[in-house]
């Protein structure tokens, strides 16, 4: 996702500096920093696109580089409580925090994928990302509100994807895969393309999505809502992250 945003922002005329501790390719026109702190220094806007588990550590590593002129946008799938905690840390620097939720696979929508944002930095994030073609809903609430909406959506989408995958694998084992696919497609407005997307994307992004679903289950539990299906989806995603194959 970071690569996608960096490419789009560079193409839109913005000066982009990025950091990735892994071997990810550096998009053309993007300056690659040696550290997150270096990448953030002097930036007008910071986009954090890591796994949710490291979001607090990332924030702590760059606090010294933030200024009151900086918008710090966290686009991870951390829980609402974590987003509020991150906002409090960022607030100590005078920077404006934005809790930003990505609604859909960026492999399909790219930088134009729909977003929800909340917090003091939300209007600026909405302005910049809308210029990239995204539809951005800037909520009036505090940080954590956007992530809460995404996790509520995930309580539908991630279990749905897992159930679809399970049904297709079962149909395959029974020699009736095409029939099962037709049954699923007839019930979903996305049709056959959505089924294929579930089958490929669920395995490809299993590790990251398992963290998101864990956060979703925790959020539902905090609301006093039973979350057996969400928890079961987490177990499925963790299995797929290890095995890398359906069935």
State the predicted function of each range.
Residues 9, 25-27, 90, 129, ...:
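A generic structural signal for well-ordered alpha-helical segments
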Residues 16, 32, 96-98, 136, ...:
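Hydrophobic beta-strand scaffold residues
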Residues 1-42, 65, 69:
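NAD(P)+-binding Rossmann beta1-loop-alpha1 motif at the extreme N-terminus of oxidoreductases
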Residues 55, 78, 82-157:
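Rossmann-fold dinucleotide-binding core
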Residues 36-97:
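Rossmann-fold NAD(P) dinucleotide-binding segment
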Residues 148-246:
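Helical "substrate-binding/catalytic lid" subdomain
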């Amino acid at each position: 996702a970071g690569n996608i945003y960096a490419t789009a922002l560079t193409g839109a005329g913005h000066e982009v500096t990025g950091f990735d501790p892994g071997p990810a390719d550096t998009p053309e026109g993007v300056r690659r920093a040696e550290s997150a702190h270096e990448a953030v220094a002097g930036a007008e806007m910071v986009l954090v696109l890591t796994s949710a588990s490291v979001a607090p550590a990332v924030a702590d590593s760059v606090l010294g580089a933030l200024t009151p002129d900086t918008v710090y946008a966290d686009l991870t799938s951390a829980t609402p409580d974590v987003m509020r905690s991150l906002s409090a840390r960022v607030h100590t620097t005078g920077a404006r925090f934005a809790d930003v939720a990505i609604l859909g696979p960026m492999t399909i929508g790219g930088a134009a994928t729909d977003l929800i944002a909340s917090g003091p930095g939300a209007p600026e994030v909405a302005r910049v990302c809308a210029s990239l073609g995204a539809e951005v809903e800037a909520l009036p609430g505090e940080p954590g509100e956007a992530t809460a909406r995404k996790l509520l959506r995930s309580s539908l989408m991630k279990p749905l994807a897992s159930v679809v995958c399970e049904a297709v694998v079962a149909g395959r084992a029974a020699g009736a895969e095409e029939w099962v696919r037709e049954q699923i497609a007839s019930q979903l407005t996305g049709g056959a393309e959505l089924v294929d997307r579930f089958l490929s994307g669920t395995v490809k992004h299993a590790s990251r999505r398992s963290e998101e679903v864990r956060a979703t289950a925790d959020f539902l539990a905090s609301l006093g809502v039973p979350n057996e299906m969400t928890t079961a989806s987490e177990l499925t995603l963790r299995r797929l992250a290890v095995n890398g194959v359906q069935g």
